[in-house]
């Protein structure tokens, strides 16, 4: 390995979210070697002293994650509903301790009562089947997006995945300006968490959702669409495919959903009127 390449790897392994472990290659099972692996830790979101959910995530940018999750799951309406936040270690992972306004905490407790007695959670924040795909307020049609700008953005999405470049184990979510420039990207071992981090950061910074789109390196599931729409995102681009429920929810809430995004290629599932070529 060249010295410059070794230096680059050392720089990346010093960031949060990567750890070296001993492993063996198929062609040399007799001699172990060190390699970089993405960290995955349990992260509990604790609201006013009550644990609400535990998610598996990369251990960085957790304040953005907690804010984005709180917004995209409808726990809060704006960052002002959170009075304070601390990330603290626990016995088996990390806790994000969040201080909610009294009004929002009362609403959360009502939701938790409906969750009482369940032994598992397939979709976090959902109490009953009727809430799956429940439409959010329909999104406005405020912008046009030139699909020709997508190609350059796709080439640069990997720039927001330093851990992913080293380990091959993260998803990315980034905000794409109408010019095709990517800003405010985040990565995580979980695709939903990467998106929540992006939503949280832009909301914290007071950025508008009307001039641009979200680009994710993963498939577009129902939750990715629902989270985006809850925060006011009008256009969601995904590198992989969309699910049927994602398409149904996007159609109902007026979100433009585009999948199979590759240079020179894209599949538009819903509301193509926001797009030009």
From Swiss-Prot:
Top-level taxon in the UniProt lineage: Bacteria
Residue ranges the record marks as coiled coil: none
UniProt-listed GO biological process terms: Mo-molybdopterin cofactor biosynthetic process
Positions of the catalytic residues: 121 (cysteine persulfide intermediate)
One GO MF term attached to the UniProt entry: sulfurtransferase activity
Subcellular location: Cytoplasm
Binding site for Mo-bis(molybdopterin guanine dinucleotide): 260-265
Entry's Gene Ontology cellular component terms: cytoplasm
Presence of keyword Cytoplasm: yes
Keywords from the UniProt entry: Cytoplasm, Molybdenum cofactor biosynthesis
InterPro entries linked to this entry: Cytidine_deaminase-like (IPR016193), FdhD (IPR003786)
NCBIfam families hit by this protein: fdhD_narQ
Function: Required for formate dehydrogenase (FDH) activity. Acts as a sulfur carrier protein that transfers sulfur from IscS to the molybdenum cofactor prior to its insertion into FDH.
HAMAP family for the chain: FdhD
Annotated family: Belongs to the FdhD family.
Record's protein name: Sulfur carrier protein FdhD
Provenance organism: Escherichia coli O6:H1 (strain CFT073 / ATCC 700928 / UPEC)
